Amino acid sequence: MKERRRRRRKLLPAGGLLALGLGTFWFYQRQAMPWMRRWGASDEELQAVLPGDELIPGPELTTTRAVTIQAPAEKIWPWLVQMGADRGGMYSYTWLEALLNCPQVNADRIHPEWQDLQVGDRVRLCMGEMPPPYTVVAIEPGCALVLAHPALTEEDRQFGPWFDTWAFVLQPADSGATRLIVRSRTARAVSWLRWIEAGVFVMERGMLLGIRDRAEGRIRAS
């Protein structure tokens, strides 16, 4: 009898940890992940067809995130076209980028020398080649900037010429404000994407807020 009680006491903590783990996994899959994938976006924005969608017509993974910026599109657009680790930065958390061995400096003003972005140019997330730079595939000045990674492996090319797209779309809102909508579409949801999805959300949310603060003049040029 005493031996059974000892075993039961040992099993109770293990069972509690298992239940906690399963509960955390359920919450992440059913609550946190759907919220992260549509942070800030309205139902209409989720359903809207945006520039770049046609490049991957049947994605396995899509995120649509958005923020309202109290500024017209022409005040926001220059911040978008100068993005890049080797240019104006990604406007996110530099301390976290440094921890990820991706140090960069976020611009606090518009740089005229970085405004002539063209289709075919590359936009780097980090200095160097990892992660691979995005290629600019479409530009609608003042409206939309679409970046993409080409499908490099034979397996990926079975899903089409593009592995993923990243679109930045500006749409007018009430009272002179603008909605910045960022949509990512991935042709093939490879397993490693699931492991980094939460981190990508943190960085992209930081980027959206960073662009908003700069366009609204909350961050003063040094």
Q: What do these predicted regions represent?
A:
Residues 1, 7-10, 77-79, 166, ...:
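Bulky hydrophobic/aromatic packing residues
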Residues 4-7, 106, 202, 209:
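Short alpha-helical segments used as structural interaction elements across diverse proteins
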